[in-house]
Amino acid sequence: MRNPTFGIIVWLGRLMRLPQLSYICIVMLRLKTLTILGSRAELASLPDGKLLINTVNAHSFNTAQKDSLFAEALQQGDVLIPDGVSIVKACKWIKAKSQPTERVAGWDLFAFEMDRLEHRAKELANAADAATGKLPLKVMFMGSSPKVLSLIEKRAAVDYPHLKVVTYSPPYKPEFTDEDNKAIIEAINSANPDLLWIGMTAPKQEKWTYAHWHELNIHCHVGTIGAVFDFYAGTVERAPLWWQEHGLEWAYRLMKEPRRMWRRYILGNVLFLWNMTKE
């Protein structure tokens, strides 16, 4: 006789329009064996050079169970940060290989990397650069809309005055053509940034970056940070500090955007718990 819990999960998978979750037989991604960054302090120990940094939370973990390329992208990236209290707690519960001590949000990664690059740029600045108006280091934002990127440029000019900001808005479509991909790659390689942010929402941003990683002739940290573009631009409000500190940022987003977020957080959290029972 079939376990009634299984029937509930099948129903949830169909309700979330994730039919593959109706057949929970093949596990694409295992939290127990993932290598995950332990804390915000460990960001300072990341090596220089070309480095792919992705994030994982309950939603992306669920999505990876039905998307083999996304699962591979998360596993094969250089650094995976725990962007969710659910990940931190689940790692303890299942006695995973990695035991992160705190949530490291995409915003934490963004703030750390931007501050570090600004500090380096300030040290490199000299009288000649100041006279010509040349900025020594460059950060690139690839993704989102021209409007959001324009707002990012304006804010970054104030927050990080020693950095040159370069942006590229790809076509807004579910999948890029070969011509689209070529144009994006050429834009990134031509810019040759000292820090690259990819913001096209998960799983698109992780899959695209992973698929084209060897075509990117750059030598810098690359972070896939999605919603941070909107947070930094101010087009989407981030949860107040109290909600963040108590691991309730997801609840705040659900409260602000219930129609868009209810599947992700209400049904998705149940599915995540079910996935943890299989670990």
Predicted regions and their residues:
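A transmembrane-helix-recognition feature enriched in membrane-embedded lipid enzymes
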Residues: 88-89, 238-279
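Short, low-complexity intrinsically disordered segments enriched in A/P/G/S/L with frequent Arg
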Residues: 3, 17-21, 130-131
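Proline-aspartate-enriched helix->loop->beta-strand connector
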Residues: 188, 192-197, 201-202, 209
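Short Gly/Ser/Thr- and charged-rich N-terminal loops/segments
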Residues: 11-14, 126-127, 131-132
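Conserved beta-alpha
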Residues: 94-123, 133-187, 191
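Compositionally biased, intrinsically disordered low-complexity segments enriched in Pro/Arg/Gln/His
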Residues: 15-18, 119
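N-terminal nucleotide/polyanion-binding subdomain common to many enzyme families
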Residues: 22-111
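Short, flexible loop segments at boundaries between secondary-structure elements
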Residues: 170-175, 218-255
